[in-house]
């Protein structure tokens, strides 16, 4: 699938090849591409380190309103690379148990950064999303799949657990507990068609339409209030963690009051409807 004009490239950790690309295909949209197509964009540390760096940079790029995350070539990501895991930084002189802890911490950080990113993240799942690749997709705010994509919680097939990188937390919240139990305990493939039906993805589209579909969603979100979008993302995620409806409603109310009282966005929306034009939100008084 072709990628658009590259405005910035984040170099790979070990290789001279750029294993993570940051591009700007449309105004206010950043596209982050896992660029290791010969390994289906597997999650080697040589990819995860620059991905973490790219996310940190994009989060504070005020020209970016929405992020699209995808993979180069035929795959989104098949998860761990068991043949070429890459190099974990800052592990000199550590014992194997501590080395393992640092490795898992790095992968966990990537998942959490997607959730904490200031901008909404759309996962453009262009092929297999397996194991850790499924976790990456679930950490995004919105998922759109190409027709050739499929999903698998692969740990159970490898004699391990299927629980990794937040999967046992994220998947039940996305599709319900019974379906999550069945998918994680059987390790079976979930097609793009089924993923759309059960709510694992928002929609599936023909392969050649995937990026344009994601850009269209991103462009719509980019037209709204920046703090409105950011606070809505925050409250959606905090709602998944909320201990009670009452506590969450208070957090929602404070966010709504913040934007209502500190900006003229609502007045602009009312005026725009009366004048039959698109609103222009300044996020200011």
From Swiss-Prot:
An MF annotation (GO) of this entry: enoyl-CoA hydratase activity
GO cellular component labels: plasma membrane
EC number: 4.2.1.17
Swiss-Prot/TrEMBL catalytic activity: a (3S)-3-hydroxyacyl-CoA = a (2E)-enoyl-CoA + H2O; a 4-saturated-(3S)-3-hydroxyacyl-CoA = a (3E)-enoyl-CoA + H2O
Superkingdom, taxonomy of origin: Bacteria
Gene3D superfamilies recorded: 2-enoyl-CoA Hydratase, Chain A, domain 1, Lyase 2-enoyl-coa Hydratase, Chain A, domain 2
Keywords, comma-separated and alphabetical: Fatty acid metabolism, Lipid metabolism, Lyase
Entries under InterPro entries matching the protein: ClpP/crotonase-like_dom_sf, Enoyl-CoA_hyd/isom_CS, Enoyl-CoA_hydra/iso, Enoyl-CoA_hydra_C
Example GO BP: fatty acid beta-oxidation
Keyword hit for GTP-binding: no
Job description of the protein: Could possibly oxidize fatty acids using specific components.
Family statement: Belongs to the enoyl-CoA hydratase/isomerase family.
Matches recorded under NCBIfam families: PRK05864.1
Name listed for the protein in its UniProt record: Probable enoyl-CoA hydratase EchA12
Organism: Mycobacterium tuberculosis (strain ATCC 25618 / H37Rv)
């Amino acid at each position: 699938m072709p990628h658009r004009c590259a405005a910035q490239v984040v170099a790979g950790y070990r290789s001279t090849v750029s294993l993570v690309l940051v591009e700007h295909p449309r105004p206010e949209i950043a596209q982050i591409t896992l660029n290791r197509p010969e390994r289906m964009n597997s999650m080697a540390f040589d990819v995860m380190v620059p991905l973490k760096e790219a996310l940190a940079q994009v989060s504070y790029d005020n020209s970016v309103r929405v992020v699209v995350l995808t993979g180069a070539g035929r795959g989104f990501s098949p998860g761990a690379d068991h043949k070429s895991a890459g190099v974990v930084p800052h592990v000199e002189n550590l014992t194997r148990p501590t080395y393992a802890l640092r490795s898992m911490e790095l992968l966990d950080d990537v998942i959490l950064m997607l959730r904490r990113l200031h901008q909404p993240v759309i996962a453009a799942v262009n092929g297999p999303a397996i194991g850790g690749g499924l976790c990456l997709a679930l950490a995004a705010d919105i998922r759109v799949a190409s027709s050739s994509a499929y999903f698998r919680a692969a740990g159970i097939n490898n004699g391990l657990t299927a629980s990794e990188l937040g999967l046992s937390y994220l998947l039940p919240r996305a599709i319900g507990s019974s379906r999550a139990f069945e998918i994680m305990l059987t390790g079976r493939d979930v097609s793009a068609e089924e993923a759309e039906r059960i709510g694992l993805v928002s929609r599936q589209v023909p392969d050649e339409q995937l990026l344009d579909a994601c850009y269209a969603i991103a462009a719509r979100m980019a037209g709204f209030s920046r703090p409105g979008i950011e606070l809505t993302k925050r409250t959606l995620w905090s709602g998944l963690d909320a201990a009670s409806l009452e506590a969450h409603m208070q957090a929602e109310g404070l966010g709504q009051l913040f934007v209502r009282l500190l900006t003229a966005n609502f007045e602009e929306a009312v005026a725009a409807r009366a004048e039959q034009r698109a609103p222009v939100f300044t996020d200011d008084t």
